[in-house]
Amino acid sequence: MKKHFLNSTLMQGLSLGLLFLFASVTAYAQRYSYESIPNDPMQTRIYTLKNGLKIYLSVNKEKPRVQTYIAVRTGSRNDPKETTGLAHYLEHLMFKGTTHFGSSNVEAERPYLDSIEARFEQYRHITDPAARKQWYHQIDSISQLAARYNIPNEYDKMMTAIGSEGTNAYTSNDVTCYVENIPSNEIDTWARVQGDRFQNMVIRGFHTELEAVYEEYNIGLSSDWRKVYAALFAKLFPTHPYGTQTTIGLGEHLKNPSITNIKNYFNKYYVPNNIAICLSGDLDPDKTVASIEKYFGNWKPSAHIDVPQFPAQPALTAPVDTTVVGKEAPMLFMGWRADASKSLQLDTLEVIAQLLSNGQAGLFDLDLSQKLKVQEVSAGIADMDEYSVFYVYGQPKSGQTLQEVRSLALSEIEKLKKGNFSDDLLPSIVNNYKRYYYTQLDNNQFRAKQYVD
C-alpha cells in the first residue's frame, strides 16, 4: 500500500511537471503575437514590441546565415535647413561607438567631446576667415586629445569577429538603413551590439569623419549625372526637400556642422517606434524576437514624432527645361512627378517603364536602341514616401542633339498611350516580374530588403 502511494505521488508529480513544462513551452511560443499576410510566399511574421519597435522576420534555411537591416524612418528629407547633409553624416557617425565600446576611457574622453561640440557651435557662426582658421586649430588640438581614448574601427572589428559580412549603411530621402549579414548562431550577439549602438551612440572623430563626407561631396561635384539629377528634382519639387536639398548636403553646411543639431536629430528620429528591424535567413522566430526584445525592449519610445510637413507641390502645367553645364558626354533627363511609392499608380508606372525599356522588347529597345537611332535611352522610377518620379534617360549619338533624342523618346511614349505595341508585350512583362520575384526568394538580401522598401 505504501509502495502504491509513493508511485501515485511520483506519477502525480510527473504529470504536474509535464503539464507545467507544456504550459511553459506554450506560453513561450505564444509570448510574441505577430501579424502575417495571406498567401505570402516568404511567410513573413510582423511583430510589434511594446515600445513600438517593428520586427519583420522571414525564415529561409538555404544557408546558415541571416541578412539584417535596421531601418530608421528618416532621411535627408528631415535634414534641418541650416545643416543639410545631417542624416547622411549621422549615418557615418553611427560606426564610431557607444558608451560601451569605441573608447578606452569614456569618462576621461567626455569633457573633450563636450568641448568639441561647444566649439563647433561657435565656429559655425564665425565668418572671418582668419578667426575661423584659428578657432578650427583649437578644435583640432582638442580633438587630438580626445583621440587618445579613441579605439578606431572597433565596431567593424566586433562585426568581423562574429563572422559578419557586408557591414554597410545608406541614407536616402526617407530612410537611413544599417546592414549586416551574420551567421545564424550570432543573432543574440548582433542584437546586443545593435541595441547598444542605437541607444548609447557617442559622436567621436567628428571633424576627421567630416573630411570623409566632404570628399564624397567633392566627388559628387565632378559627376554630371548627379548634377542633372539634382536639377531635375529641383524643378519637380520646388518647395519640398526632395528638390530643395540633396542627401549629401550643401558644401556651406558641411563646412559649418553642428554636433548639437545631429544629437537633436538622433534623439528625435532614432526612437523604437520609428524603426523596423528586418531579418531573413536561418532563424528561429521566437528566439530571435526574444533576443531583440532583451536588448531593445527597454528602449523608451517617443510620445510624438514631429515630422516636418510640407505643402502640396504646385501643379506642373507646362514643360520646364533646364540646362546643366558639365564636362561629360551630353545626356537627357525627362521627369514626371507622380504619387507616393505606396500608391497603386507606382505599380502602373513600373509596368509602363518596362513597356518602354526592358533591354529587349520595349518600345525604346525595338524602335530606338536596336535601330541605332540614339546612343542610349531608358525609362525608370524613383520612388519616395511622398512622391515618385517617372523618368526617361537618354544619350545622343554622334552629331545628334538632345532635342532630337527628346523628340524620339516622346514619340515612343505617344505610341504607348495609343496602345501601339505588340499584344504579347504586356503579358510577357507581367510574367517576367513574377519570374524575377520567385527566383529571388532564395536570396535573403532580396527578402529582407522588401520589408525596408
Predicted segments, located by residue:
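M16 family metallopeptidases and their MPP-like homologs
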Residues: 58, 63-76, 85-87, 103-196, ...
